[in-house]
From Swiss-Prot:
InterPro entries xrefs: ATPase_proteolipid_c-like_dom, ATPase_proteolipid_csu, ATPase_proteolipid_su_C_euk, F/V-ATP_Csub_sf
Protein name (record): V-type proton ATPase 16 kDa proteolipid subunit c
Family per record: Belongs to the V-ATPase proteolipid subunit family.
Post-translational modification: The N-terminus is blocked.
Species in which this protein is naturally found: Torpedo marmorata (Marbled electric ray)
Length: 154
């Protein structure tokens, strides 16, 4: 895919794609972890026996960062000095795809996890509903990962 006549700056867009994949997905994971962790801390004062059961949103938020890491490593390993502008733009699109969808998924997981953990402490039957909603929020990040893998392997 490399082109000998590629502009000198073409690799820049691939590097930005790798950076965007990691930065935005890590921001989403950090927000999801912090927001869910706050709910767990508040809930555990009254119901400490539910702490381990309530850790699921934090784990799911952490998985979002792994999606970004996978794409960032794929992009970084395929960067060369003479990469074509087309390939570099594909890498930028892949990084933005997984990064921004990871940011959105992290926000959703954090908000749902916080409310779900607090609600489950009051009414244990809400646990299954919380898990289902968390799965739908996690899938948002997975969609971005799928699109990013398609783009980065072209």
């Amino acid at each position: 895919m490399s082109t000998p006549g590629a502009p000198e700056y073409s690799a820049f867009f691939g590097v930005i794609g790798a950076s965007a994949a990691m930065v935005f997905s890590a921001l989403g994971a950090a927000y999801g972890t912090a927001k869910s962790g706050t709910g767990i801390a508040a809930m555990s004062v009254m119901r400490p026996e539910l702490i381990m059961k309530s850790i699921i949103p934090v784990v799911m938020a952490g998985i979002i960062a792994i999606y970004g890491l996978v794409v960032a490593v794929l992009i970084a390993n395929s960067l060369t000095e003479d990469i074509s502008l087309f390939k570099s733009f594909l890498q930028l699109g892949a990084g933005l795809s997984v990064g921004l969808s990871g940011l959105a998924a992290g926000f959703a997981i954090g908000i749902v996890g916080d409310a779900g953990v607090r609600g489950t402490a009051q009414q244990p039957r809400l646990f299954v509903g919380m898990i289902l909603i968390l799965i739908f929020a996690e899938v948002l990040g997975l969609y971005g990962l799928i699109v990013a893998l398609i783009l980065s392997t072209k």
